[in-house]
């Protein structure tokens, strides 16, 4: 079997080697080990009141009675239309939008720009962009930048990996530099809400990269780690705050920050935040922000729940949709679906890893439905000599960061993940996504495979479809047809509408996570059953890149 877009190299499982020995840096076995030692966080599954008692000194977050007229005035319209954009005729604008699959909603929408120079950014912003080596703006940036710089409330609907982060990050930097400097005790000027810590960290990296010339300070606030460093950052003062909703509410309730200075609010991956149950927290947070702020909402899909949130909190917004509003997969991704039994999955997985390993630079994400399965797959692969690491919600943040860094740098080019852990991960060069377990709904399928084929690159998504996934059959086939993918004959037997009660986007979610939180039980975990990395894997299997024999990635015989 071969995959479209591969580099015409022959099978060579040792291609993943050549990494000069054990690239774990002789780390002790507590890294990514599964003898939990008491730090598993079972029972904290809720987002809103995570099982902690409220202390008496916590503030009660109530909606202020805003008097907009008495609030300090602020500037939010910075857009100066470039002369080349001014010259664009109505027909030229319509043709450009058609070519880039843009659909516009609202009145007085600025014309799209076509180059970085046309965007109207100050020179200090433009310099940062050009130094990154980008050739031209993405479609969402071409229309999103003029909309955001004009100070209007706006909605951007575009697929994951389309460049949404820079669409709001760069205008946010311009916005900050036009506001008065922070005084002691002031909260941020720009607030970005994101569904997961991984996405929040990724956003922070972009803000740091493009805000350095202006010396704009930022911090990232999320759960799963101690509050102390986050509190210190907030108390020193930051212009940009990137946060997950739950931890931000914690910080507001204990008085470590406030949102009185926020005039630029971003809701990133709004559909994900609502899907994860964050709507009450979002509403509580937004109520703490002055109503005449500029609000930007970004989403990969446009379900009715997101539409309602936009109606409640955005004023006279303008909207750009890139591509179809129907759920769709990127056309740069080759989708391969195999109808298999659960018994066949492991053999099929190894076969695909052998194919992928002919490119020594490949990065592969394997999705599993539960934390336990995630651990079991990783254990199986590592025993077989594959350099795999796992990431899921039971892991401490320090451990997750280490795993991501090993994956990002290619030292461990296989990462086994659950949906929640992988949300927001933006790693360049992911060639393959393997759905070892199909997700519970079609939206998560599209989101998973969107880890590859980003920003115009090509990628391959392989999915193991079993009889247990039959309720997804019709929707999966529809997604594949829209992307002009070849549909296997044994999948076509599932091409029928799901039976009653199955919502086309959200049905079937109730079964997810049933076995979550059991990682390490019943099979000893890595640290217990197999002696940890330094013992069982480092000694018995040669670690990542060393022995057995001359193995690197996969020469395991």
UniProtKB/Swiss-Prot annotation:
GO terms for biological process: alternative mRNA splicing, via spliceosome; nuclear polyadenylation-dependent mRNA catabolic process; nuclear-transcribed mRNA catabolic process, nonsense-mediated decay; rRNA processing; termination of RNA polymerase II transcription. Belongs to the DEAD box helicase family. DDX5/DBP2 subfamily. Its main location: cytoplasm. InterPro entries: DEAD/DEAH_box_helicase_dom, Helicase_ATP-bd, Helicase_C-like, P-loop_NTPase, RNA-helicase_DEAD-box_CS, RNA_helicase_DEAD_Q_motif. Residues 506-532 are annotated as: RNA-binding RGG-box. A motif (Q motif) lies at residues 114-142. Residues 145-320 form the Helicase ATP-binding domain. The keyword RNA-binding applies. Coiled coil: none annotated. This is ATP-dependent RNA helicase DBP2. ATP binds at residues 158-165. Pfam families: DEAD, Helicase_C. PANTHER family: ATP-DEPENDENT RNA HELICASE DBP3. One of its GO terms (cellular component) is nucleus. It is an enzyme of class 3 (hydrolase). It is found in: Cytoplasm; Nucleus. Its EC number is 3.6.4.13. Associates with polysomes. Keywords: ATP-binding, Cytoplasm, Helicase, Hydrolase, Nonsense-mediated mRNA decay, Nucleotide-binding, Nucleus, Ribosome biogenesis, RNA-binding, rRNA processing. Residues 19-34 have a biased composition (Basic and acidic residues). The Q motif is unique to and characteristic of the DEAD box family of RNA helicases and controls ATP binding and hydrolysis. Residues 1-58 are annotated as: Disordered. One of its GO terms (molecular function) is snoRNA binding.
